[in-house]
Amino acid sequence: MIRIPLIFTLVLFVGCANNEYRFERIDGPQATTLPLKLDGFHGTRDGASVNAEARFTDGADSLTMNIALYLVPPPEFRSGTYEGTIGGKMIKGQVDCPSIMFFGGQSDQPSVGGVFLLKDEQNRSVYRIRIPATPMSRR
């Protein structure tokens, strides 16, 4: 009898494990977590269009990611770019988003989250950012 609640708890824990923020450098099949923290998520909504900016910082390292969403069921990621400095190196490129979340209506404070892949000049994914649904403040 005690096994059923234990199994349920384990399944619940595993199912919620990916709901944490993480900024990773992709090194081939390996990913290395970097200490950059989400410093702010700002944006505007105009009808079905959302433009947002996320800022990440850690000491001298900083990165800004700009994304555009279109709110149809389900929400669509339209485009994104990033630029910043990591490890003393200037970086910039395109953003891809295989998974996006958007919650909130016209009058509610919207929340945005998802998995964002930052690409280099050769269109290779070099960074992955996992963001749980995070309230977006107005610019």
For each of these PLM feature ranges, what is it?
Residues 12-15:
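C-terminal motif of bacterial Sec signal peptides marking the signal peptidase cleavage site
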Residues 19-108, 113-134:
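Central antiparallel beta-sheet cores of small beta-barrel/beta-sandwich binding domains
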